[in-house]
Amino acid sequence: MISDLSAEIIIIGKEILNGFRRDCNVESIARWLLKNGFSLDKVQIIGDIDKDIAEALKLTKARLIFVTGGIGTTRDDRTRFVIADAFKRKLRLSKESVVCLSEKLRKRNVFFTNRYRELCKFPESALRLDNPRGLAEAFILSVKSRAFIVLPGVPFEIESILALPSFNENIRHFFSTKKCEGHILGLVGLRESEIEDICLDIPEFQRGKVSLLPSPGLVYLILQNKKLLPLLKKRFGNYIFTYSGENLEQVVIELLKRQNKTCSVAESCTGGMLGEVLTSVSGASQVFNGGLIVYQNEIKIKELGVSSNTLKNFGAVSKITAKEMACCVRKKMKSDWGIAITGIAGPSGGSKEKPVGTVFIAVSGNKQNKVIKNIFSGDRNIVRISAVRFALNLLRRMILETVK
């Protein structure tokens, strides 16, 4: 049984290295590593040059190495060839891969050409991995006591591969180990400093055995010792929205599904971000009825049904307007819950009474309504993200109150 469950990630792609495209894969892989008991020690981003890829491969020290990108059909997709050469393995054509890829191409009305034939070649002794949402199959290559997992660079393809039960089984087979789960607690509504203050007397926090990963509106706690879970649950209660690293929007969608409830949204300063976040979750159509982006007052009146007197007397950024927006969208879209966001995201538009970052967030249910005023700090995007996450959490907590 291997005790050193260290891991590294090598990101290949000059478009990422040059800043033309943002990497979206490290987070997904890092979450998988933690949930399966691995420790991520290093991340490298390199271009598509053969010698740079080979050097990066040979310098790795971890037991598990993820390599993403460069296994497609273009000329600069060189990863499989460089890996085979670096570890002195011949590339072999997989007949099974040819059959699988031919069927995928047939469904897309695409001919199987020599270009696609290259996707079916793997280093000797490599284990093929299915790619449910793409053409290029991933593979695992064992080199002495280490395993190289070679994945495509497309984020949604990587996520689909990591979610396969067979993927986890293959990794555990390579390491001859039982599943060793880490824990990712998600806390919403508390700042990083507040969490640290609450946990000052816990030895694991003092010794740096718990990592805090803050982002706008929420903080993730990463811990390996599950014995801490009862204590943290007692201290943080409903501030915890996940014990296994899910996104807040995933938790909200699943909660709505379990309660057989629906929601709809009315957004001003967030410009559709709340609706986008909710609909990014698979299965959201079961519980999300729709949303309206109502920037101008006349649209709030005409399309949503907000009272003109409310807007005239209290303004668009107000507690009363937010409440009406939530109630109106709930009734208009025949939902169980209506969520509304109205505010000043900046950088202009603020005043002494309502500075930039002022946001009113309302949730309306059949029997209860809540409106909360916030003043978020940060740039325009941070304010909008913070508002969306606050709205999701307010909905989550109100749903939980109804099932007590």
Locations of regions flagged by a protein language model:
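An accessory alpha-helical subdomain
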Residues: 143-228
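Short beta->alpha junction loops
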Residues: 42-52, 375-378
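Short alpha-helical segments enriched in small residues
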Residues: 102, 118, 229-404
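Flexible gly/pro-rich beta->alpha loop and the following alpha-helix that scaffold active-site loops
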Residues: 67-93, 236-245
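Glycine-rich phosphate/diphosphate-binding loop of Rossmann-like nucleotide-binding domains
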Residues: 2-43
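Short glycine-rich anion-binding loops that position phosphate/pyrophosphate groups of nucleotides
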Residues: 14-15, 70-73, 153-156, 218, ...
